[in-house]
């Protein structure tokens, strides 16, 4: 089965923005003295029309609240199963629509995001969707508060704290649909990380492949955690965004195997989409002056770690060579962008074993 077929066989889900809008639509029905619709149908930006079952419903004088359980389908989304509630409260005529961050929804505290500092982290498309359902209900003057149960703790497992979104989650989505394993959320977070770094005047950021490389890079460079952009396997996504939105200095930090893939030209470092080229590593050892015995043993290796261990035992700077080659590939992607590139190769113990740029 190819990846396209595999993606089609997986169950899609709905974004936090779609869930919040569905909850709001139900609350608005109750606010105008109609029964809560259950399920509540919602038309998404691309025309899909899912129905959302209500998990909670409540009314009071001049207000109504409804809740929906977030269903991310087969995507490994940290918000899957979270209760998302919308509370609509009538305001005096002329007040307009006012969005509030309820419990578990974050507040923007740094520039560079598509929302102003101090605003609730309800992104532009979900806001537009909510505005549309309010208009359809004939309600122009409302306070709309979105809450996510346990959102503050869930947010600690996301990029929000580093992006300066504090107190909870973001209400996200551009299409309303979560495509399983599309990685769109990760790419979105990479881009927002670059935007925030630029807006706050950072001259040096570190793209890391994981927690080990992050710790090693920060210790080695003396930078704080807010310099980190957790690119995971998506080095290409980071580089392509930096090409158009440059930051003066980028350090790429990762494990030897992943960065050997980058040195070979791979821009998606996931094992399903790029494999370590063991023969290429053996050829590099030969170019560094390895004996034929070492080269032959490297050619028989099963993993990149085995080749690195051979190189270290022979006193050959293979990791440094990989760092320089990876930096060359990165610069080629960046083109004429004014970004200085350096690379740190980190072993599994968290030690920097190669550096180049």
Curated annotation (Swiss-Prot):
It catalyses: Co-precorrin-5B + S-adenosyl-L-methionine = Co-precorrin-6A + S-adenosyl-L-homocysteine. Pfam families: CbiD (PF01888). SUPFAM superfamilies: CbiD-like. Keywords: Cobalamin biosynthesis, Methyltransferase, S-adenosyl-L-methionine, Transferase. It is an enzyme of class 2 (transferase). Its EC number is 2.1.1.195. GO terms for biological process: anaerobic cobalamin biosynthetic process; methylation. It comes from the Bacteria. Pathway: Cofactor biosynthesis; adenosylcobalamin biosynthesis; cob(II)yrinate a,c-diamide from sirohydrochlorin (anaerobic route): step 6/10. One of its GO terms (molecular function) is cobalt-precorrin-5B C1-methyltransferase activity. The keyword Transport does not apply. HAMAP family: CbiD. NCBIfam families: cbiD (TIGR00312), PRK00075.1-1 (NF000849). Belongs to the CbiD family. This is Cobalt-precorrin-5B C(1)-methyltransferase. It comes from Rhodospirillum rubrum (strain ATCC 11170 / ATH 1.1.1 / DSM 467 / LMG 4362 / NCIMB 8255 / S1).
